[in-house]
């Protein structure tokens, strides 16, 4: 049988290409990560109050929602109404994205196991590919009787496994700097950790982002200045941004 050269390209079987990187959609961030986060990974984002952690997470989810990657936000302390208002400051219509099935904002349940189940159920309902937990300290402190100190690490590991395996998501886990250091979570976060800090320079408080750890990615090892602008979280990258990169195995 001779091959028909007139067969249209669309009729030819195409090999499915699986994209291994997830673009954050945050200006400057993906340039520091060789294109984005590793798909189906969990990354810890830590910083003090007012550093912009929630904005970072929202921007990550909004970008995904607008690019066929629905997302889940588990918000422990902020209500939907508060989040809607926060998003509106940057032109993000979170309520519309929710109604469109591109975003789901869920609250903690009465038990930790029920919260895990709600994450799994919601991810299947909307076909989620992204998730943000805001925040880990608030989540765990919500269950003082269920999660004792010795149970925090296995509870955290379970959360990571559920997000990446059961939920099939690439997740950002938000934490407070002091709390994260106290429990040394960076030692067993599966993929990476990003830290937000501030410094006084010439009498002005400047904000900096540092990728402290990101396995399987050649990433910047420098601190990078960032600001919260009308467009959201913006990272400034110097022209010589390729310097100071290393391959983390």
Model-derived features: where do they sit?
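C-terminal regions of RecA-like/P-loop NTPase motor modules
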Residues: 2-19, 220-249
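Pre-Walker A adenine-sensing motif
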Residues: 24-36
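Conserved P-loop
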Residues: 43-44, 48-114
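Loop/turn-to-beta-strand initiation segments
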Residues: 70, 102, 127-130, 166-173
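Conserved nucleotide-binding/hydrolysis micro-motifs of P-loop NTPases
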Residues: 77-81, 109-113, 137-139, 177-181, ...
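Phosphate-binding/switch loop-helix module in NTP-utilizing enzymes
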Residues: 107-165
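Phosphate-binding/switch region of NTP-binding enzymes
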Residues: 170-232
